[in-house]
């Protein structure tokens, strides 16, 4: 199967009709750039002379922004604090008119803020201002109520879990059950090693480290990765496990042994911030619009290639993905990965 620009354009056009509900950990990503010209006299550390600062939505909010840039209608729900970071995040999201933002405000809880300091484009320090304890039972109840209020109008539920406390285990399970009862597609970007929590989801999107953690073993060879993912998919009744493999692309595995592997395309890597969110967004949007699995994988892989070439938390446009199409190659489809 071959994904060319005309096929990709049709897939992206179909995304315009989708309403996708994103629930998960909200973050604000801040980037401080400057130059290092001396070492501090107070300690043997570099002194950064700041020149610019920018901020953008991160975590589940970045997934929502990527979906909106593809043309989907998005409802974003998550917990945040009653602080300046939450105000800044809401202001940034106003730049995306296709996103309806429904925050659950938790008094006294800091909104996750990740500040990256860069010198000459090279990250030298990251400071995380956040807590990771689960949100309170009352906040979980409020979040669940807000999800259920809009679930019937959505085509898909995406759970974007960064293990920052917005999605405790019991809440994940209840949201999946509610979505299945409403006959909605469910995609989960997991952080928990116990994949039984994600039972019955349509798509699970771990990276290789997360898959290995779930399997309780190290994984390096492609055939072993595929076999392990297929086994876990069958065990937990997961439709497809899409494992992101960094420089090796994306591998989709199903419980019956079906595999789709799309190798990564060589590009200069500038910044990987948010690239995983881009993959989740594009795969989800393509599947929600009715795209076949190999095409969804290939489209997401092209988007990832664009994302890593960008500075800051990546938000990829439809035009950028289409411009990347000349590098596309056939998707490998096989029931066994021998010889790959």
Model-derived features: where do they sit?
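Conserved phosphate/ATP/ADP-binding segment of small-molecule kinases
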Residues: 164-259
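Structural motif
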Residues: 21-23, 126, 155-158, 187, ...
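Conserved phosphate-binding/catalytic loop of the ribokinase/pfkB sugar-kinase fold
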Residues: 100-109, 114-151
